[in-house]
Amino acid sequence: MKSVVIIPSRMASTRLPGKPLMAIDGIPMIQRVWQQAIESNIGEVFVACSEIEVHDLIVSNGGKAIMTDPNLPSGTDRVHSAFLKINNNKDIDIIINLQGDMPLINPEHIFKVIDPIKRNFTIGTLATNLNDNELNNPNVTKVEVDFKKNEIAQALSFYREVTIENKNLYHHVGIYSYTPDSINTFINL
């Protein structure tokens, strides 16, 4: 199966404007995310952006960047727009949406997000154990999953605020995998 990683990036973040170019130990955040995606060795890596500064940074470091409409409503819309531009041969089986603010993501986890697609799910994501500090933090997305001793299972619901105690809550990791049909369907909801 042919996979591609697309990293959506925008400078006009509501919570932290200019975030993609903010340096972490001297290297812009978006460049660090792009490097982690390259390290995963899963397939081609693209940064989907609407600002020329981000585009030029990635290209000047040997990467591939796709310019997208600055008015797109979400990162997934940006990923979809870039996917349509690069899938000329209709040969991409898996699209990985890696958030542009995940500079510390383990490259192995990027590779792991395709496992649900290989098992006939149409959308995949990752979850990890939730610690006590994260449970009531609205900035941490929680996902309800009943793994039943399986490593891969269906997500039942996503939460920011938790109003009931649920033992099946996990910390949702903001990376997704899609089949071409599922991302097309998702965008058109």
Question: What residues fall within each predicted segment?
Answer:
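Short phosphate-binding loop-to-helix
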Residues: 46, 52-98, 102-112
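Conserved core of the sugar-phosphate nucleotidyltransferase
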Residues: 105-189
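N-terminal glycine-rich phosphate-binding loop and ensuing alpha1 helix
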Residues: 2-49
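Short beta-strand segments
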Residues: 8, 97-99, 126-127
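Nucleotide phosphate-binding site architecture
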Residues: 22, 55, 184
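Short, high-confidence coil segments that cap the C-terminus of an alpha-helix
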Residues: 42, 90-92, 119-122
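Residue-level signal for inorganic ion chemistry
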Residues: 30, 101, 179
